[in-house]
Amino acid sequence: MKKRTVAAILMTSAIALSACGEGGSSTSYSGNNASSTIEASSELDSAEGASNDQATDIQTDGNKDTTASSSEGEKKQKGKGSKSGKKSEDSSEGTLAYTLSDGEEIEGGTYTAENEDESAIGAADDTVATITGATINKISGDATSADTSSFEGVNAAVRVYGNATVTIEDCEITSDAENATGVFVYDGGTIYISDSTVDVTGGGAGGIQVAGGGTLYAENLTVTSASKAAIRSDRGGGMLVVTGGTYTSTGSSGCPAIYSTAEITVSDAECVSENSRAVIIEGKNSVTLENCTLSGNDQSTKEGSIKANVLLYQSSSGDAEDGTSVFTMNGGTMTSNSGAMFYCTNTSSVINLTDATFELSDTGEFLIVSAGRWGSDGSNGGNCVLNAEEQTIEGTITVDDISSLEMNLEQSDYTGAINSSGQAGTVVVNLSDDSTWTLTADSYISEFEGDLDNVDTNGYHLYVDGVEVK
């Protein structure tokens, strides 16, 4: 056995981390009472995306009268039910067609919003309420500001904020207006939603969302979004925990299954993006997947786009704090139908993989760490740490000359080549005694730690700091 350590001086890539982000009708209530090109958020790849500086101010009349009608016998209330169904002004912009009262328990009924900047139902001001078996529709009335819609939930079908807590069970929620998210929580609010459907067909809106410190727990949902991510967050972050269910994004290249500017955990669920990346993490945020099935089909067409199933990056829009993006996958299967499996650019990132299965696209690329469309030329590479435990990895890895990679393999097997075209960025490979690396082409790295007997060159050559070592 030949134990050998080959070291080189690590050249840390400079990463320029810019701020981040993305880029009269009647209302009825019935029933139960940088130096180069700098891009904004990746979701702006879709035509429906809007940036901060495109936002317009909104003027909302909180005293505006609305009509409300209820179906007799459809509603069963307990506690202090709000029976008027009148519109009330929000803590910021926008209104609610029906405002839940503290202690209210709704069973059945239909709740509908038709006006601009109006949600069908919601709660604020420390309210605790429950909705069961209801139909909730946002059928018309576009948001007057894409920003207040995306950051504060104005115009969402369901909107909870101001430290309110709402439990939603067995409900049907639809949204068909512009910038009208399905279920939105922010400003210290909490939503527990289970066994429900959320169908969002309007532009500029996601399925279930947190922002501004909101918390959302979702269980066994069927969520479909036609414009933005089925599971998403925005400025101010929060926490989103998903267990079970199916989450599908059907929109354009800016419509991933999961978009994170928060802490997002998904377990035992199926997540599909028909025309975009499966997962996007922006800035100092995370996505953790436990025994999930995911697929993406990146159809990015913008100049300089690098197609990939998972994007870890920092944009310039101000929606996510600068820092390390973290992707963790334990078990489950992820399929890339277009492009590399992972792409890290203009940020630092950590990818943690344990006993997961990856199905590569025809490109055969597993990981790209490089400059891209975000940040300033010359300082917008990526710094990535890849940790694999009890993991099988296949595919090529590319690290450009302003980027870095540290790959740590424990009880894992890697079959592929790293920088097969020659030395570029800093690459460190740490191979445990119970791990292997089988080359599929000549590979060029900066530093190797481990037993070279565990490296099968397969007829190719391994170069460490410019020296052929095997």
Go through each PLM region and give its residues:
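Bacterial Sec-dependent N-terminal signal peptides
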Residues: M1-L10
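C-terminal motif of bacterial Sec signal peptides marking the signal peptidase cleavage site
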Residues: A16-A19
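Bacterial signal peptide processing site
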Residues: G21-G24
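Extracellular/periplasmic low-complexity linear segments
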Residues: S26-E93
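N-terminal segments that cap or nucleate solenoid repeat domains
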Residues: G81, G85-A143, L462-V464, V469-K470
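Extracellular beta-strand/beta-solenoid scaffold signature
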Residues: S88-T95, N115-G122, S145-R159, A177-F184, ...
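All-beta strand scaffolds that present successive hydrophobic residues in beta-strands
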Residues: E104-G108, V128-A134, T165-D170, T190-S196, ...
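Extracellular beta-strand/loop-rich repeat segments of large surface/secreted proteins
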Residues: T396-K470
